[in-house]
Swiss-Prot record:
Name of the protein in its database record: Adenylate kinase
Organism phylogeny: Bacteria, Bacillati, Bacillota, Clostridia, Eubacteriales
Segments for region (NMP): 30-59
CDD domains noted in UniProt: ADK
Location in or out of the cell: Cytoplasm
Record: residues binding AMP: 31, 36, 57-59, 85-88, 92, 160, 171
Subunit structure: Monomer.
Gene source species: Clostridium novyi (strain NT)
Enzyme category, top tier: transferase
EC number: 2.7.4.3
Gene (name only): adk
Cross-referenced Gene3D superfamilies: P-loop containing nucleotide triphosphate hydrolases
Domains as described in the record: Consists of three domains, a large central CORE domain and two small peripheral domains, NMPbind and LID, which undergo movements during catalysis. The LID domain closes over the site of phosphoryl transfer upon ATP binding. Assembling and dissambling the active center during each catalytic cycle provides an effective means to prevent ATP hydrolysis. Some bacteria have evolved a zinc-coordinating structure that stabilizes the LID domain.
Binding locations of ATP: 10-15, 127, 136-137, 199
InterPro entries (UniProt xref): Adenyl_kin_sub (IPR006259), Adenylat/UMP-CMP_kin (IPR000850), Adenylat_kinase_CS (IPR033690), Adenylate_kinase_lid-dom (IPR007862), P-loop_NTPase (IPR027417)
Pathway in which this enzyme or protein is active: Purine metabolism; AMP biosynthesis via salvage pathway; AMP from ADP: step 1/1
Length: 216
């Protein structure tokens, strides 16, 4: 199975990617991991990517595409893969399609974990973390026993900067702008499968599994 995973921040993509990877024995490939590995190993592509990142610039599409294509040639991808964080643009999606076609392969499905903005806001802005021991909480779904204090070390729990309402709204807006053209691209090719991400983790995974196994 060759799949890509789409979804807004806070949709639970990481959790589902782990479950899919384990059940179907395919690698979960994230662009962040690819960048980090190539940079730490000082590969030619990694050195180029680091030059852009050190300047605070976005890594160009062409370089990102080369890095992903290189990763997809590895032995563990022969039976399939799950791409997370790529493609982000229609240009990248077209490049992925071209790469797969040239290797006599095709994408089986583009999974979209769909979650309304109001749900994401509640899920992400409610997150709290202990700055001392790292324990995680949620003011609605998993609150500490004593309000505002960590169960483990009794320190005051905090909201990370990434989880403030303003930051979350901005991330959702960026995601919507970037992803809608991709949704249209895969929908036009009948490769898009939309999953209701407001369900429980188990329900979302069951829906995805049924779709994957129906596609085999």
């Amino acid at each position: 199975m060759r799949m890509i995973l789409l979804g807004p921040p806070g949709a639970g993509k990481g959790t589902q990617a782990k479950l899919i990877s384990e059940k179907y024995s395919i690698p979960h490939i994230s662009t962040g991991d690819i960048f980090r590995k190539n940079i730490s190993e000082k590969t030619p592509l990694g050195v180029k990517a680091k030059e852009y990142m050190d300047k605070g610039q976005l890594v160009p599409d062409e370089l990102t595409i080369d890095l992903v294509n290189d990763r997809l040639t590895h032995e563990d991808c022969k039976k399939g893969f799950l791409l997370d964080g790529f493609p982000r643009t229609v240009k990248q999606a077209e490049a992925l399609e071209k790469f797969l076609t040239e290797n006599n392969q095709s994408l089986d499905t583009a999974l979209l974990i769909d979650v309304p903005s109001s749900f994401i806001l509640e899920r992400m802005t409610g997150r709290r973390v202990c700055p001392s021991c790292g324990a995680s909480y949620h003011i609605k779904f998993n609150p500490p026993k004593i309000e505002g204090l960590c169960d483990v070390c009794k320190k005051e729990v905090i909201q990370r900067k990434d989880d403030t309402e303003e930051t979350v709204k901005e991330r959702i807006e960026v995601y919507d702008r970037q992803t809608q053209p991709l949704v249209d691209f895969y929908s036009s090719k009948d490769q898009l499968f939309v999953v209701d991400g407001t369900q429980s983790i188990d329900q979302v995974f069951e829906t995805i599994s049924n779709h994957i196994e129906g596609d085999k």
